[in-house]
């Protein structure tokens, strides 16, 4: 496997970075560009930006901040939010994003995955999956999680959607484990291991990082390609250079920092 990736996640609302707990009660964390520059300087391998209001509000991502970020950073970044057709995806990529991520729009129209893969290549197409464990013990998919008042519980099992999205042409997947989001108790290793067994494309873990050992655990125990986190990076609780040094000491290969 290639070097494991450390990926700060920036949830965007109204032109600012915000962060919630279990996808609720978001608070302001700072300016988009300032945070992007900070993470680039610290040695982040890439960035992910989620315009969390776009899909619930029926709009596309705001291209202006995408262009600002692209002008100022030189590491790859991925953008998600209301990307429901090839034209919108093309505009986001032309604004400077390296990859586009789709979540709710693909659940409404799965063929979108194939359309984007055909238009831009699978390497540009990331499928994000918001997953939660229900009372029957099954993990199932949620849609429109950027707005708690509009979030929809779907009958589709997470594992079934992983298999379908991969078949349709997803080049990478991000599994957002909603039960663990923002609580800093560690990644959902059990769920990630089941997804890893099905997923032949790069898999990124999201939700639950609270200390450096959590990153080591998810790489060692779930064999993911990258680990995404937000609150521990935004707050400064885990500086990226120290995290990479820690992982190297655990014999986990990571890229050199900037």
From Swiss-Prot:
SUPFAM superfamilies: Ribulose-phoshate binding barrel (SSF51366). It catalyses: 5-[(5-phospho-1-deoxy-D-ribulos-1-ylimino)methylamino]-1-(5-phospho-beta-D-ribosyl)imidazole-4-carboxamide + L-glutamine = D-erythro-1-(imidazol-4-yl)glycerol 3-phosphate + 5-amino-1-(5-phospho-beta-D-ribosyl)imidazole-4-carboxamide + L-glutamate + H(+). It is found in: Cytoplasm. Keywords: Amino-acid biosynthesis, Cytoplasm, Histidine biosynthesis, Lyase. The active site is at 11, 130. Belongs to the HisA/HisF family. Heterodimer of HisH and HisF. This is Imidazole glycerol phosphate synthase subunit HisF.
């Amino acid at each position: 496997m290639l070097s494991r990736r450390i990926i700060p996640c920036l949830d965007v609302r109204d032109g600012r970075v915000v962060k919630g707990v279990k996808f609720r009660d978001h608070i302001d964390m700072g300016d988009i560009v300032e945070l992007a520059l900070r993470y680039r300087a610290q040695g982040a391998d890439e960035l992910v930006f989620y315009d969390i209001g776009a899909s619930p509000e029926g709009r596309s991502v705001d291209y202006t901040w995408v262009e600002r970020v692209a002008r100022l950073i030189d590491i790859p970044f991925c953008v998600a939010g209301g990307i429901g057709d090839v034209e919108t995806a093309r505009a986001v990529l032309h604004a400077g994003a390296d990859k586009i991520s789709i979540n709710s729009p693909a659940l409404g129209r799965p063929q979108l995955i194939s359309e984007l893969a055909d238009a831009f290549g699978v390497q540009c197409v990331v499928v994000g999956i918001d997953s939660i464990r229900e009372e029957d013990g099954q993990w199932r998919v949620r849609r429109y999680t950027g707005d708690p008042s509009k979030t929809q519980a779907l009958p589709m099992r997470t594992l079934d959607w992983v298999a379908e999205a991969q078949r349709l042409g997803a080049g990478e997947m991000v599994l957002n484990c909603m039960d663990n989001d923002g609580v800093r108790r560690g990644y959902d290793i059990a769920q990630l291991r089941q997804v890893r067994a099905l997923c032949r494309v790069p898999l990124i873990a999201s939700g639950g990082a609270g200390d450096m050992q959590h990153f080591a655990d998810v790489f060692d125990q779930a064999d993911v390609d990258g680990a995404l986190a937000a609150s521990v990076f935004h707050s400064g609780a885990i500086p990226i250079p120290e995290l990479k040094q820690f992982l190297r000491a655990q014999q986990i290969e990571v890229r050199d920092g900037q």
